[in-house]
């Protein structure tokens, strides 16, 4: 169980605002954190990882206190044993795929090989990072995060470089791993299908706080778009309360919805 309450003053594109967060994540639960760009979602991940300071606050993970500003407690990032997938991956370019994944726990070879298989990286284990595609590098970053995570997994747009077929495989493997390892997960993503597939709970960050009236927000209604089925020529999507059909050669449809 993750319990976090903290405050931090941020400077965004629209000026300064206060981040005032009260968050709980259960074991083996994936929580999606939604919100506009610049709302502070990535900052929250970095605070939980110990990579950014807060003005005041408290973080507890499985009854262990990671942060308490009143008691001047601060657990260093390397002591938190979390997995973190950054948007820029932050891999070691001079190491190969296996060495990057094994960096946190080099002796746990059985787990390393399982994660290599989970991320479809078996045939790339000796490849240097600089020779990988964007999607391959992203899978390496995710695999390394899974090896490192003991309690908490932080995912910042973790699958946005993958094609749809591979993404579906990786998503299911990721869910199985999270359940098996009892990880608490905080996911930041702008992909509605990804959120629907991975997350049990969705929270909306609005004006520096997690909005208590999420069900009334137009942004969340975008999650009601989901693929239904395909036939010979068309892909069919459900957009509550109606169904629309698009030509199958429309590979990445963009929906403009009016909720007024």
For every predicted segment, state its role.
Residues 64-69, 109-125, 176:
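Conserved ABC ATPase "signature" region
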Residues 66-84:
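ABC ATPase NBD coupling module
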Residues 128-132, 136-138:
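Conserved ABC ATPase signature
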Residues 142:
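Hydrophobic anchor residue at the start of the ABC signature
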Residues 147-151:
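A short, proline-enriched helix->beta-strand linker immediately N-terminal to the Walker B motif
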Residues 153-157:
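Catalytic Walker B motif of ABC-type/P-loop ATPase nucleotide-binding domains
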Residues 182-188:
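Conserved H-loop
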């Amino acid at each position: 169980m993750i319990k976090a309450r903290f405050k931090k003053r941020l400077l965004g594109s629209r000026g300064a605002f206060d981040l005032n967060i009260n968050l709980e994540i259960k074991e083996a639960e994936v929580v999606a954190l939604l919100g506009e760009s610049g709302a502070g979602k990535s900052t929250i991940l970095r605070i939980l990882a110990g990579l950014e300071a807060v003005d005041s606050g408290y973080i507890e993970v499985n009854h262990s206190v990671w942060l308490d500003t009143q008691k001047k407690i601060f657990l260093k990032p390397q002591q938190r044993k979390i997995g973190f997938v950054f948007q820029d991956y932050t891999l070691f370019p001079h190491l190969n795929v296996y060495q990057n994944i094994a960096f946190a726990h080099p002796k746990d070879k059985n787990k390393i090989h399982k994660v290599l298989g989970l991320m479809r990286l078996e045939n790339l284990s000796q490849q240097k990072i600089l020779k990988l595609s964007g999607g391959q590098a992203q899978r390496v970053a995710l695999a390394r995060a899974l090896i490192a995570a003991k309690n908490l997994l932080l995912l910042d747009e973790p699958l946005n470089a993958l094609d749809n077929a591979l993404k579906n495989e990786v998503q299911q493997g990721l869910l199985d791993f999270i359940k098996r390892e009892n990880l608490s997960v905080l996911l930041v993503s702008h992909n509605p299908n990804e959120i629907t597939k991975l997350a049990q709970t969705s929270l909306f960050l609005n004006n520096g706080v997690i909005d208590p009236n999420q069900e009334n927000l137009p942004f969340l209604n975008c999650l009601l778009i989901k693929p239904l089925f395909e036939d010979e020529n068309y892909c069919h999507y459900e957009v509550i309360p109606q169904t629309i059909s698009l030509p199958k050669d429309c590979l990445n449809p963009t929906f403009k919805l009016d909720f007024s």
